[in-house]
């Protein structure tokens, strides 16, 4: 715990530096940036009719495990003695100590920032080599763009030959200086009309239109998780099953609702229905189809095939819990990409991030004015930890008593659990 606390302390000093020197098109493990920013950047640079058509899909072999200690010690602006101790401390597996001669600290909270700072600079190298030039009075651009999320990255170009003979060797040399190598098997060059997978999305051009939709692997993995729940909880109450499934559906739907997901969502909804039908049939193998349908599926708002269960609330009143459907619960939502030069540690950017946070919360709290009022009244912060209440961390409405009066507060889930645990220990 002491080691993690010390890493957190040094990270507080290092992170503002890393943000200032970071590649503007790097999105992984950075404050206020997320996967969707990287996906939207891909969409923006590839959507036009004259956009680049060739993509290098980069894959680094064991990035976190092979970063050169010498490079880190020479280039990371922090106490070298402390950094050396963290890098050389090794790790314990099955009660056995293993030394570390390369790579960032295993499971260290400072490791993602160290990895980011190692990979930063590639965008600048590419920009300096492939500048816009004027040829016979016309402006010419090689259309070389980098988009990176942690150790996943793509590089675009107007032709395959430049990617294969110039850019790929340049990237390999950049990585080699840092103790890293590209995977020959997984680093491939793809045409945009064939499409490529990036951060769970398949990005492909049809004519002049770019479509970003869930990959087949992502759909398969999600349904495996759904079936794991239905098969692993054969005897649980319908209400409990719905709560478990809704948590997974909500997370998956919120991640993908910014893409072209209509067909994918309908397909997944149907597969979830089939999994639930099998779950119900196993419970009542001697009952007919109509009995099973009437027992578990109900007519709600005109939809007679709504998987729903009645339950009693804490106040004793009866309510109904319904299973979320991806197609109807998560309509397409336009995503606003972060501006590349915005720095969350820069006071001049504070107004931008405040507006961005409010616009996100307006979407999250749409139709719930009382919660929006509560959020503003609390200064947009959790009353327990003082950290922002936003879309990055799970939070909920918690009833409490203040000055002898009942009221509601928006509190982080983790803070609420910790508060209850501490109160229980005091008793």
Question: What are the residue ranges of the model-derived segments?
Answer:
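Conserved polymerase palm-domain catalytic core
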Residues: 21-25, 30, 37-195, 380, ...
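Duplex nucleic acid-engaging cores and interfaces of nucleic-acid transaction enzymes
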Residues: 1-9, 19-21, 35, 39, ...
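Extended C-terminal regions of large enzymes
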Residues: 271-275, 280-370, 381
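Short, intrinsically disordered, charge-biased short linear motifs at domain edges
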Residues: 366-373, 397-403
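A conserved non-catalytic segment of reverse transcriptases
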Residues: 88, 94-97, 178-252
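Histidine-centered nuclease catalytic patch
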Residues: 386-424
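Right-hand nucleic-acid polymerase module
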Residues: 229-290
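Short metal-coordination and nucleic-acid-contact micro-motifs, chiefly zinc-binding Cys/His arrays
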Residues: 374-380, 405-408
């Amino acid at each position: 715990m002491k080691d993690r606390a010390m890493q957190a302390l040094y990270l507080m000093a290092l992170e503002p530096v890393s943000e200032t020197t970071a590649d503007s098109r790097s999105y992984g493990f950075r404050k206020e940036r997320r996967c969707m920013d990287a996906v939207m950047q891909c969409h923006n640079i590839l959507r036009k009719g004259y956009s680049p058509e060739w993509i290098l899909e980069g894959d680094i072999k064991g990035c976190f495990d092979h970063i050169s200690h010498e490079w880190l010690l020479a280039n990371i602006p922090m106490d070298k003695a402390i950094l050396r101790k963290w890098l050389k401390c090794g790790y314990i597996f099955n009660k056995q100590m293993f030394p570390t001669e390369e790579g960032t600290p295993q499971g260290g909270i400072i490791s993602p920032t160290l990895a980011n700072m190692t990979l930063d600079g590639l965008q600048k190298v590419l920009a300096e080599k492939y500048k816009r030039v004027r040829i016979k009075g016309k402006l010419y651009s090689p259309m070389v763009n980098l988009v990176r999320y942690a150790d996943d990255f793509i590089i675009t170009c107007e032709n395959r030959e430049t990617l294969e003979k110039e850019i790929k060797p340049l990237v390999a040399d950049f990585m080699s200086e840092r103790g890293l190598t590209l995977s020959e098997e997984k680093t491939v060059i793809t045409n945009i009309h064939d499409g490529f997978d990036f951060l769970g999305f398949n990005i492909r051009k049809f004519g002049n239109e770019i479509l970003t939709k869930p990959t087949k692997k992502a759909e398969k993995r999600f349904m495996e998780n759904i079936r794991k729940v239905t098969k692993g909880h054969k005897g649980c109450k319908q209400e409990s099953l719905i709560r478990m499934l809704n948590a997974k559906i909500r997370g998956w739907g919120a991640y993908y609702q910014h893409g072209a997901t209509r067909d994918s969502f309908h397909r997944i909804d149907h597969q979830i229905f089939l999994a639930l039908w099998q779950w119900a049939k196993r419970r009542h193998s001697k009952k007919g189809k109509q009995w099973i349908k009437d027992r578990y599926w109900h007519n709600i708002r005109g939809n007679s095939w709504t998987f729903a269960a009645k339950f009693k609330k804490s106040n004793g009143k009866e309510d109904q819990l319904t299973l979320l459907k991806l197609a109807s619960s998560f309509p397409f939502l336009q995503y606003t990409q972060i501006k590349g030069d915005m720095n969350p540690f820069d006071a001049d950017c504070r107004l931008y991030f405040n507006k961005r946070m409010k616009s996100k919360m307006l979407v999250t709290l749409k139709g719930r004015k009382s919660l929006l009022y509560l959020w503003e009244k609390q200064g947009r912060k959790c009353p327990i930890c003082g950290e922002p209440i936003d879309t990055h961390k799970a939070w909920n409405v918690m009833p409490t008593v203040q000055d002898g009066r009942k009221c509601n507060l928006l509190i982080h889930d983790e803070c609420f659990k910790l508060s209850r645990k501490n109160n229980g220990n005091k008793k």
